[in-house]
Swiss-Prot record:
Pathway: Cofactor biosynthesis; biotin biosynthesis; biotin from 7,8-diaminononanoate: step 2/2. NCBIfam families: bioB (TIGR00433). It comes from Escherichia coli O6:K15:H31 (strain 536 / UPEC). Homodimer. HAMAP family: BioB. This is Biotin synthase. PROSITE patterns: RADICAL_SAM. InterPro entries: Aldolase_TIM (IPR013785), BATS_dom (IPR010722), Biotin_synth/BioAB (IPR002684), Biotin_synthase (IPR024177), Elp3/MiaA/NifB-like_rSAM (IPR006638), rSAM (IPR007197). Belongs to the radical SAM superfamily. Biotin synthase family.
Length: 346
């Protein structure tokens, strides 16, 4: 296997400093070398345990330390989760992501988490979880249950991280990613733009991700969703071009990874989202809720896909089939009919 050269901070900084149109052109070239530019991977995210998190992440409404009006909920019943997964598949998602607001799962929760993974896989969906810190044994148990992806974001650069979170170290996050990788689970890891970080911090985040022993298969890039009651509620808005630039640099640095538009799409107009796809984004969360923050309504996503000529990617999985995704793609490509406008209800 050929040695993969490591990125340097100066190289990443040079990318961020490129004229935007030159950067977009390079990112689109890289994207087309590794992906079908018309295909977008579609995921649905469900909060399986909401609120009362002991962590102090300053951006997060689920922290018990902030008064955001969010009601805490217990871990959902397995069948409730699987019913949501069925609806996600019916709406065209190929990956179902389950997130829990805690620092780490307890051993008594593991059998239920394993059942959720097994049930999602039995439907023919890819299964993803984000549960906080994992032990080696927990990572292996989830792998044995069939978990495809584990999400654990680095959030920002190591240098800026302490300004945002103090209850979990940066190294703890890196250690969890290593345990997940060693268990044979694909890694999903990214960060947030708009925390108050500098461009150098954005470069530092992408440097950490790209220089992992194996870069993440999926890289979610979030735009801060400012929630009243959190310490970052009054942060400055993120300039759309700065966000697009971050997407483009991520694409160039991690050419074979899926780059996902995650939180914050509700704040983006269609033109900004279109430029993100041009910059190399090829994955979205699809649905009305992104954990506890708004996400564009499904039908708006389908209409945007139609305008841009994008198709939801079909994903081969060990269990189930892609009949639903084929029906959704057919609906997307049939404009001006009831089938198209009701594609989300298929």
């Amino acid at each position: 296997m050929a040695h993969r050269p490591r990125w340097t901070l100066s190289q990443v900084t040079e990318l961020f400093e490129k004229p935007l149109l030159d950067l977009l052109f390079e990112a689109q070239q890289v994207h087309r070398q590794h992906f079908d530019p018309r295909q977008v991977q579609v995921s649905t995210l469900l909060s399986i345990k909401t609120g009362a998190c002991p962590e102090d992440c300053k951006y997060c409404p689920q922290s018990s330390r902030y008064k955001t009006g969010l009601e805490a909920e217990r871990l959902m019943e397995v069948e409730q989760v699987l019913e949501s997964a069925r609806k996600a598949k019916a709406a065209g998602s190929t990956r179902f992501c389950m997130g829990a607001a805690w620092k780490n799962p307890r051993e008594r929760d593991m059998p239920y988490l394993e059942q959720m993974v097994q049930g999602v896989k039995a439907m023919g969906l890819e299964a993803c979880m984000t549960l906080g810190t994992l032990s080696e044994s927990q990572a292996q148990r989830l792998a044995n249950a069939g978990l495809d992806y584990y999400n654990h974001n680095l959030d920002t650069s190591p240098e800026f991280y302490g300004n945002i979170i103090t209850t979990r170290t940066y190294q703890e996050r890196l250690d969890t990613l290593e345990k997940v990788r060693e268990a044979g689970i694909k890694v999903c890891s990214g960060g947030i733009v708009g925390l108050g970080e500098t461009v150098k911090d954005r470069a530092g985040l992408l440097l950490q991700l790209a220089n992992l022993p194996t870069p993440p298969e999926s890289v979610p890039i979030n735009m801060l969703v400012k929630v009243k009651g959190t310490p970052l509620a009054d942060n400055d808005d993120v300039d759309a071009f700065d966000f697009i630039r971050t997407i483009a640099v991520a694409r160039i640095m991690m050419p074979t990874s899926y780059v996902r538009l995650s939180a914050g799409r509700e704040q983006m107009n269609e033109q900004t989202q279109a430029m993100c796809f041009m910059a190399g984004a090829n994955s979205i969360f699809y649905g009305c809720k992104l954990l506890t923050t708004p996400n564009p309504e499904e039908d708006k996503d389908l209409q945007l896909f139609r305008k841009l000529g994008l198709n939801p990617q079909q994903t081969a999985v060990l269990a189930g089939d892609n009949e639903q995704q084929q029906r959704l793609e057919q609906a997307l490509m049939t404009p001006d009919t009831d089938e198209y406008y009701n594609a989300a209800a298929l």
